[in-house]
């Protein structure tokens, strides 16, 4: 198939070529095309005959944590059978198989744990992860690093006891002052759980207010059956709105990857009119997130094959929205915008701009270079015990950034930060 012909959709249409303003690479285009075929349930995708960026495609898939998905779609392709590509193809196959096997193990381990929690009268809501995976025909190819649970605080004591009895490990806790997020890891089956009492960090000025939008979520929850196990989760409207808000949160940090857009599309296709789209659109408009989601929806329609009309979602403004800058940003950023240290550091500028609701200032530049102790604790755990060593952490951070710059050609965190602040303005998040 010639490179400029694209790949046909099931309805005979083709992915549109990027316009003169588009800046996607050929590798990024092929990733999207293979990904869309996977989401549609196709058996395979064929790369262009003279495709020579196989290594770049593999690296990009790894950056977005969809290595197994892309390999599954192209494993029969002639490009992978070429002698010069044999070593890479073998390595890719090995990694893909390992990822899928680990996901199967993690899913089984989590379902076993969830049933034990239910028997003890503990009913956390499963958010994203397992639920999103279930929307895909080959669910274990859509890997998850963890399972997010939303729990009522009054159930924590029993929840914690059960997990510790099952061999899960966690950090020491002050039971009178529980943190926003409590991670548990089981070294036996590699299940990793992030427990939450709220969906967003309450003290974060840029998005902590989003918690109020989910008041009563437990009262509205539904039950999904996955592999024979009844799983409690958010209602279709709450869950779809949460996926948008979760992506928005990471957009305000250092970004998010294409997989989150895929999950939105798959959830919309699964629940269709069970989602109250009018309620979501009204909330998005009030929160200045409507243009942001219109761009995501346009990405879903033009590049991931989503017919939004069939889901009940109607957006008359979508045609006027330029989704390309957002698409390029999320493709370059990888999962949660973690593609480079410089990009991760830039998060402080976008967060500060969102808090202030305006363009980056000297204070946001300072925040990027020298973030507060609450942010730094996430990267230097010893600050939890020795917060007065914050200046030492700043020095280590700057040296780490300098080392990263020696091995990359990435823009500085300030340049990336300024560019991403402009994205916030473009999508009307800030003035």
Label each residue range with its predicted role.
Residues 13-23:
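Short, Lys/Arg-enriched N-terminal segments with co-localized hydrophobic residues
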Residues 24-145, 151-431:
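Conserved NTP-donor binding/palm subdomain of two-metal-ion nucleotidyltransferases/polymerases, i.e.
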């Amino acid at each position: 198939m010639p490179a400029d012909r694209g790949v046909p959709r099931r309805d005979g249409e083709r992915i549109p070529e990027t316009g003169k303003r588009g800046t996607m690479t050929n590798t990024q285009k092929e990733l999207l095309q293979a990904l869309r075929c996977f989401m549609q349930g196709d058996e395979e995708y064929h790369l262009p005959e003279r495709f020579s960026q196989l290594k770049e495609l593999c690296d990009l898939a790894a950056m977005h944590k969809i290595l197994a998905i892309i390999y599954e779609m192209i494993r029969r392709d002639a490009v992978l059978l070429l002698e010069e590509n044999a070593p890479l193809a073998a390595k890719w196959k090995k990694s893909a198989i390992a990822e899928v096997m680990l996901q199967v193990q993690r899913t089984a381990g989590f379902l076993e744990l969830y049933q034990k929690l239910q028997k003890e009268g503990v009913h956390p809501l499963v958010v994203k992860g397992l639920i999103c995976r279930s929307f895909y025909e080959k669910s274990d190819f859509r890997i998850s690093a963890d399972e997010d649970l939303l729990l009522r605080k009054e159930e924590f004591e029993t929840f914690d006891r059960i997990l510790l009895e099952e061999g899960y490990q966690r950090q020491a806790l002050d039971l009178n002052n529980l943190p926003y997020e409590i991670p548990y890891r089981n070294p036996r089956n590699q299940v990793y759980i992030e427990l939450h009492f709220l969906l967003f960090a309450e003290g974060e000025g840029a998005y902590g207010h989003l918690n109020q939008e989910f008041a009563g979520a437990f009262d509205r929850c539904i039950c999904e059956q996955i592999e024979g196990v009844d799983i409690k989760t958010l209602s279709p409207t709450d869950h779809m709105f949460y996926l948008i808000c979760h992506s928005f949160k990471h957009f305000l940090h250092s970004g998010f990857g294409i997989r989150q857009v895929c999950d939105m599309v798959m959830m919309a296709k699964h629940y269709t009119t069970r989602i109250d789209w009018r309620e979501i659109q009204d909330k998005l408009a009030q929160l200045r997130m409507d243009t942001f989601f219109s761009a995501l929806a346009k990405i879903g329609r033009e590049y991931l094959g989503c017919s939004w009309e069939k889901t009940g979602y109607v957006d008359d403004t979508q045609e006027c929205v330029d989704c390309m800058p957002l698409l390029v940003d999320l493709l370059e950023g990888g999962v949660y915008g973690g593609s480079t240290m410089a990009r991760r550091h830039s998060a402080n500028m976008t967060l500060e701009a969102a808090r202030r609701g305006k363009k980056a200032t000297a204070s946001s530049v300072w925040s990027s270079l020298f973030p507060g102790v609450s942010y730094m604790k996430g990267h230097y755990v010893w600050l939890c015990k020795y917060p007065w060593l914050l200046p030492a952490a700043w020095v280590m951070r700057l040296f780490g950034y300098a080392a990263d710059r020696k091995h990359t050609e990435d823009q500085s965190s300030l340049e990336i930060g300024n560019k991403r602040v402009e994205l916030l303005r473009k999508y009307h998040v800030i003035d």
